[in-house]
Amino acid sequence: MFDLDEELKKLPAKPGVYIMHNNKDEIIYVGKAISLKNRVRQYFQSSRNLSTKIQQMVSNIDHFEYIIVDSEMEALVLECNLIKEHRPKYNTMLKDDKSYPYIKVTVNEAYPRVLFARQQKKDKAKYFGPYTSLGAVKDILDLLRRLYFIRTCNRNLPKDIGLERPCLYYHIKQCKAPCQGYISEEEYRKSIDEVIEFLNGNYALVTKDLQAKMKAASENLEFEEAAGYRDLILSVEKLSQKQKASDVDGVDRDIIAFASTGDEAVAQVFFIRDGKMLGREHYHITGVANESRSSIMTNFVKQFYAGTPYIPRELLLSEPLEEEELISEWLSTKRGQKVRIHVPKKGDKERLVELAEKNASLVLQQDSDKIQREEAKTIGAVRHIADMLSLPGIYRMESFDISNTNGFESVGSMVVYENGKPKRNDYRKFKIKSVQGPDDYASMREVLTRRFSHGQKEAEELAKKNIDISHGSFTRYPDLILMDGGRGQVNIALEVMNELKLTIPVCGMVKDDNHRTRGLYFDNVEIPIDTHSEAFRLITRIQDETHRFAIEYHRSLRSKAQVHSILDDIDGVGQTRRRALMKHFASIDAIKAASMEDLMAVPSMNKLSAAKVYEFFHTSSERGTETT
């Protein structure tokens, strides 16, 4: 048993990180302190100076633990790492967890390659970036191949020169085949030097060279080649426009500003490298209600730079940091040289920060508009359905359907929607056990009985163990049951509810002769739905999703049964080999068409078993074709 008063007395007056847990042993908050003794005790003294969010957090603390470190700097680093790993509920959280791509030039190799890299490593290669999108890196790599004919293979050169034939890129004139010795190491190095100049932003030199080549090709009446150079020039110009200069001092800097409303905020970061705007990105932050602007900025900077390997020389911020000196020291240590943190008040730097803030505000507004549209599709649609059925409110809906082929491999599906959105973790599928033949009503009775009786039994078992019933997989009941059908299906569901002494409203989703949603059957009345309403669209989505989930499960069982019925007849081919064959060929048709060599190439197959499979499919012309 955790004795709070005793544990508070044991707290040391040393720097460290404290970790708050709730009664489920979940980490709900992580913080750092110069003195653990003083900081942690503050939470359990007067609550007058605590924000509403922190007061709520304290009320949920069941126990805490702490880790002692040697300095406040170590505490900061550990705090950032723990927040990133555990994403505690009451910490201000950076939603986006992105790592940005780099371009890597393996200058430590005799014939360097130019590659995509997810992170920087200490491997003596030269890195450029980070870039804000994988697409941008792919475009640049493609352009570099066409400009400089650099290799893309993983061959060990010069050791492997001449051992294999040149690859496709040589034949389409995007590689000079150093693997064949067609270009010397010195010449190839010159191309790599030009690549590095290009990646450093020296586009003018490249453009000038391409223009000269285009002119020469045109004068020689080589118009197709001239057109190729023209396209390359346009590609270079397009890239240079994307990375246009935003200042002239050539300093690497990040510009950060944010906009907030309620509990949400959006931070905008401009990435400037070598004085050029490399790109920009926005990040969503939650849990900012009642937080000061300085606190929001501080938490963002800590989480953002804890997860990125590259630290620029300067940060231009819209708000001052609460721990500026400590964070500057931390970032400087990560970078290996001094990092300047500044809130500009005039000039071009202030203009750039204001521009970042305007962009953040725009994204926040767009998000708000999007949320309103989504709510109209989901929560608004659910409210409309509740009003149509005269229900006080609907949060959770469960929809049921049956799928079979003439009673063969009959299955049921349960699809769950909460607040108008699918909750896929709660989907359930049922293989019908008690019904023989195509009887959808009896099958539905079995599915509903199993689903809700299971929930009742599970709730009883959890209650005996003093465990909250919300932890059960079947104990959460819906506010509305949706049946894929009309009066007949609804009556079956109502009978099951009556037998289990449950009072859950049941509604049927009625379709017309063309199998399109027509209305709702509720309380012995069919209620028409406006086909242009969000409620109609939501009902249609639920109906389609329930049908999809049921039919996919039915098809998977039917396919397994078909596979078993054919392959099981082959002597010497057991379950392991049957699975291996289906995994390798994917269908019975493909197995039937396979040669002996193809069959022997399958893992776990030998010459004898391959011969038996081959003979099985080729000795009888009466053998039918079945596919999964």
From Swiss-Prot:
One Gene Ontology term of the molecular function aspect: DNA binding
Main location: cytoplasm
Entries under SMART domains matching the protein: GIYc
TM helices/strands, residue ranges: none
Cellular compartments annotated: Cytoplasm
Gene Ontology terms: cellular component: cytoplasm; excinuclease repair complex
InterPro entries, A to Z: DisA/LigA_HHH, GIY-YIG_endonuc, GIY-YIG_endonuc_sf, GIY-YIG_UvrC_Cho, RuvA_2-like, UVR_dom, UVR_dom_sf, UvrABC_protein_C
GO biological process, one term: nucleotide-excision repair
Keywords in alphabetical order: Cytoplasm, DNA damage, DNA excision, DNA repair, Excision nuclease, SOS response
Domain GIY-YIG residues, every copy: 13-92
Domain UVR span(s) in chain numbering: 204-239
Family: Belongs to the UvrC family.
UniProt-listed HAMAP family: UvrC (MF_00203)
Function, as annotated: The UvrABC repair system catalyzes the recognition and processing of DNA lesions. UvrC both incises the 5' and 3' sides of the lesion. The N-terminal half is responsible for the 3' incision and the C-terminal half is responsible for the 5' incision.
Subunit architecture: Interacts with UvrB in an incision complex.
Protein name, entry field: UvrABC system protein C
Organism: Lachnoclostridium phytofermentans (strain ATCC 700394 / DSM 18823 / ISDg)
Biological classification of the source: Bacteria, Bacillati, Bacillota, Clostridia, Lachnospirales
Protein's gene: uvrC
